[in-house]
C-alpha cells in the first residue's frame, strides 16, 4: 500500500516549529528526522550556514557527501540547537575535512562553479530527491532562483522543501556536466539525430534529443526496473493516445485540472494507460494536500480496505483532508468486498478510482457502479505507440536511423563522445508499434528486451572473435525487434469480455455466410488460447440454431468435430474446427425450428393463470384405476389407420395456435 506523504498538509504547518541545524529551515517537529535524512544527502559535511538560498545550489554542485562525512555532520549538527554563522576559519577547516576524502579545498565563493567530474561521479552512489519524470538526473547547474535568493529571509518549510525537490530534479535531461562539456548542444548532434529530435517535437514533452550515451550507461539505465515503469508520465501533457477520454476540452480533463476528481472506474485493455492515469492523478493530488492511497486487489484483503477507510475518516474529521483510494484490478474483489466501499463512497469519505480490464457491467457491483463514472480507455493507436516509443528512445540516447538513407552507421570508426552509442532503424520502431497491438507496456518492455539482447549478443560476439568491443557501433534492426516479441501480442481473455466478443463475431460471420471472416475469428480465438472444445460446443449449437432443417447433416458434422477435438486436442484439431466452420458458412440457413421453439417458450411465460391440463385421451393409463378415470379414452393409435387421423393434440385453450407461423399466445 502506498500513501502520499504529509509534506503539503496545511494543518501540520501550524504545529510546533523547529529549525534544521543544517539548512536553517523552519518545519514541524514531527518531520525533523525525515528532513535531516534528505538534508544531509543534499548538503556536504562542514557547510552549515543560515543563509537559505545561496549555498544550496552550490552544495548540490559539489555532489553528495561521502558516508563518513554524513555521520560526522549528523553528530555535529545534533549537538547544535541554534548554530551561528561559521567564521571564515571554521569554514576553511570544514572544507579541509572534505578534502581529506578526496575533495578539493575551495572557498564559499566557489559554490557557483560547475560541478567537477569527481563530484558528478558521486551522484549515482547516493539516493537523490525524487524526480518528476523518468530518466532525468540531478543537474549540477545552479538555478537562477537559488542565486537570487541568497540574501532572502528564511523561508517556510513547505517552500524550502518545494525548492529542494525542484533543484534536485534539475533543468536538463543529461548529467550535471553536460552543459560544461557542450554535449547537449544541438550543434554536436549528427544530422539524423537532429531530424529525429525535430520529428519528435512537442509530443515528447518539448525536450531535445538527449546527448549520446555510452552502451554501458544504456545497459545500467535498463537494468533493475522495467522500462514501462521508468517512462511512466507524471502529467497529462505526456499522456498519449486517449484524447477521447482525457483530451483537450473533455469533461474529465477539466475535472482533473481543477482537482475536482469524482469516483471513477477506468475500463480498458492491458497497457492502455489505466494505472498511468491514476499515477498522474496521484502526482497532482500531492500538490493539493490530498491523500492518495494505492491498493491492488490481487493481494489486498478486506481488512486492508477497512484500515484505509478508517484512516480516511480520521483525515477528514481532524484535518479536513480528502482521500483518494485507487484499486488496481478491482474486478478481483468479490461482490461482498466491493460492498465495503458503498457507504463511504456515498458519503464522500473516500473518492474511489478502480482500474479493470473486465467489463464493469459483469464484474463490478451494480450499486457501486451507479456511484462511479465509467471511463472507457481504448486500445492505443499505432501513432500513439510510435510517440510513446520515441519518447523512450530519446530518453535512452538511442539514435533513430532513417532506412531510406544509404549511410551505414557501422561503417565509420569515430569514437566521439557526442556520437550515439546505439542506433535503431525507423522501420524497427514502426514494427514494434504494430506488434504491440496497442499495449504500451508490451511495446516498451519489448524495446527494453531488444536493446539488452543486442548489447549482450554483440559483446559476446566480440569476446569470442577476439575483436575489441566498440559500443558505439550497435544497431537494432527490425529482426531484433521481432525476435524480442516472438509474435504479435494478441489481446484475448478466456474469461473476460473479449472471449464473448470473439465467439459472437464467429457466430455472426457463419450466419452471414462469410467464410473468410469465419476463419479469421476462429484463428483469433485459438491463437489466443481458447479451449477448442468450447468452440466445438458452440458449433453444435449453431448447427441446429442457424442451419437446422435446411441441412440436417450439419449437426452430424458438428458432433464429429467435437469428438475429433476431444480425441486429438490442439494444435492438430484446429483444422477440424476450420473445416466445420467453412462448411457451416457455406451451408443453407434455416431458423424455422429455432423460431418456433422460442414462440413456445414465450407462450408459456406469458400465460395467465394455471397452465391447461393435459387432455385425457393423451394421458397414459398404466393402471386399472386410471383407465376407470378416463385416462387414454378415445385415443386413436395412428399406425392403425391408413389415412391421417383427425385428432387434437394441444390443450383446448390452445386450439388453432400455430407456433411455426410466428403466432404468439
Swiss-Prot record:
It comes from Homo sapiens (Human). InterPro entries: AAA+_ATPase, AAA_assoc_2, AAA_ATPase_RarA/MGS1/WRNIP1, ATPase_AAA_core, DNA_pol3_clamp-load_cplx_C, MgsA_C, P-loop_NTPase, Rad18_UBZ4. One of its GO terms (cellular component) is nucleus. Residues 76-89 have a biased composition (Polar residues). Belongs to the AAA ATPase family. RarA/MGS1/WRNIP1 subfamily. This is ATPase WRNIP1. GO terms for molecular function: ATP binding; ATP hydrolysis activity; DNA binding; enzyme activator activity; identical protein binding; single-stranded DNA helicase activity; zinc ion binding. One of its GO terms (biological process) is DNA synthesis involved in DNA repair. Residues 92-104, 159-184 have a biased composition (Acidic residues). The gene is WRNIP1.
